[in-house]
Amino acid sequence: PTTDFAKEGLFNILRHTIEIEGAAVLDLFCGTGNMTYEFASRGAVSVLSIDRNFNCIRFVRKSAGELKCDIIKPLKFDVFKFLDNCEIKFDIIFADPPYELNEIPHIAKKVMSRNLLSENGLCIVEHSKKTDLSEDVGFQKLKNYGNVNFSFFSE
């Protein structure tokens, strides 16, 4: 999961980069929904949360219901299959895959090749220091917060 230190740093960058209020957000590998709730609380108009773990999706659905937050839409799906079939554009796509996942480099590649970002949209992939995405299409910058790295992509 994204540390509080890294999350604070990320949202500080986003505050100066993209308008979260009114944004359509896709949260990939959402887990318990930490980032989902953060985007929702900052004014996103919709947050689609994807994870293949049923318990995570059930938790996000239950929490969103308790918070009476109907902009959060949790969906149990394999992230890569979802990206292969998605035809919706998003203003912000955030991915927090397991650091040991070998397919991390494929996330931004699929987002960019499938043209899933809206105009001026932003894709952020969280990863460890061992993963280098700087040669990928659309790469803009890398930000490091301790052991957490964020790679930013746009059209």
Residue ranges and their predicted role:
Residues 1-155:
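Class I S-adenosyl-L-methionine-dependent methyltransferase catalytic core
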